[in-house]
């Protein structure tokens, strides 16, 4: 039996800073599992690098979430339609104005 490498999460290895209001809003947004994972992946790819938005491909989202790229695209489209994510061309980010988020379609 092969031994698994011990992995320990440590702030010294990096962290993603997020406003409590944003975290609470996403918990109350009623997202599907895929939508939540895509939201978190976008958060990691943007806020995790101290950026408000960035070019993030469906393949990058797929690598982070384990979801197929076309399913990442579908989840991302719903999040953009609801105003939870913003998208201009290929650049995507999180809409911090949580009062603009629409409820379930």
Question: Could you say what each language-model-derived stretch is?
Answer:
Residues 1-20, 86, 102:
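An N-terminal low-complexity regulatory-tail signal and nearby short nucleic-acid-interaction modules
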């Amino acid at each position: 039996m092969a031994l698994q490498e011990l992995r320990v999460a440590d702030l010294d290895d990096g962290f993603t800073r997020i406003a409590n209001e944003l975290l609470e809003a996403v918990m109350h947004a009623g997202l599907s599992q895929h939508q939540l994972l895509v939201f978190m992946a976008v958060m990691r790819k943007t806020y995790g690098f101290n950026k408000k938005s960035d070019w993030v491909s469906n393949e990058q989202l797929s690598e982070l979430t384990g979801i197929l790229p076309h399913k990442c695209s579908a989840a991302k489209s719903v999040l953009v339609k609801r105003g939870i994510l913003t998208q201009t061309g290929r650049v995507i980010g999180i809409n911090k104005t949580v009062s603009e988020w629409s409820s379930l379609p």
